[in-house]
């Protein structure tokens, strides 16, 4: 999959001229839903970033790029790169999901709290799960994401790190 250079330049020009500001939330969500349900959903967001549209349409996601994470847990280091890697992995599980779109959107949103991390504590992101609830809610509300998808994304954002300790929990806790 490759976008012609002329098309990329046109998309960059459209972004720079403010044409994206005239898109309705419903249209952005419709196209995003299509992008999420392609064989490689991360490419949709990579292209948006390449043409400058990610910062306009998904500023919460754009804020993740350039935010380092501890290499011990995330060898890719960059939080934005990590998010797109998670999205690519989630796609492999999406066929088994009751709501594939909810799974994929949640994967995109799961670390939005890292975009709010203060520079002086990087590469750590203490409390990013709870800090990520509001950006996830804001993004979902702005795009008029269906409630079922939004609610699942908020839960995933808040609780996604709990799975790392599941082996330590009592069965009744789980």
Show the residue positions of the predicted features:
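Long, amphipathic alpha-helical stalk/connector segments used for oligomerization, subunit docking
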Residues: 146-174
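Glycine- and charge-enriched loop/helix tracts that form the active or gating conduit
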Residues: 1-104, 108, 112-127, 131-150, ...
């Amino acid at each position: 999959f490759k976008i012609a250079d002329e098309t990329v330049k046109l998309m960059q020009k459209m972004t720079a001229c403010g044409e994206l500001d005239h898109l309705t939330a419903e249209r952005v969500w419709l196209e995003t839903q299509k992008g999420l349900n392609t064989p490689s959903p991360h490419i949709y967001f990579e292209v948006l970033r390449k043409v400058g549209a990610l910062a306009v349409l998904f500023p919460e996601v754009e804020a993740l790029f350039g935010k380092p994470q501890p290499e011990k847990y995330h060898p890719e280091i960059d939080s934005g790169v990590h998010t797109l890697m998670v999205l690519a992995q989630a796609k492999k599980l999406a066929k088994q999901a009751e709501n594939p779109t909810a799974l994929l959107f949640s994967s995109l949103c799961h670390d939005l709290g890292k975009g709010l991390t203060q520079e002086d504590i990087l590469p750590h992101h203490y409390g990013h799960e709870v800090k990520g609830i509001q950006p996830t809610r804001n993004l979902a509300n702005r795009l008029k994401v269906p409630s079922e998808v939004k609610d699942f994304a908020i839960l995933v954002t808040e609780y996604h790190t709990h799975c790392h300790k599941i082996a330590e929990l009592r069965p009744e806790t789980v």
